[in-house]
Amino acid sequence: MPDTGAIARICGIGPAKQVADYAVGKGVTYVNHTFTTHLALCASIQPFAGLKDHKICEYPVRPQPMAWEMCKTHIAPNAQGEVTVPEAPGLGIEIDLGAVKKYLIDAEIKVGGKVLYKTPSLA
């Protein structure tokens, strides 16, 4: 179960699509994996959204409040329990920057006095 929400695990949507295509070529069912935000859920379903006859999707039935409030729009299963990929641009859902700001922690990483990373502004 590749976790496309965690870049360190599979390196994003492109590599996950390669894994999904490889799995299909070997007769193996590819299943997404995420229990975090709906943003991560949207990213995790992209690699297999267009695969023929794909019917399995891991869905966080009881997301944590923080995970739910990070996005203004959400993906919900229909009456048949199926999840469809949003058709809006990008990942298809809208991020709630106000909610994200509540959890933002300023961080700065320096090596030898040189700033390598600083928390970006969410203006």
Positions of predicted regions on the chain:
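Shared catalytic-loop signature of beta/alpha-barrel
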Residues: 1-90, 94
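Extended hydrophobic packing segments that form well-structured cores
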Residues: 91-123
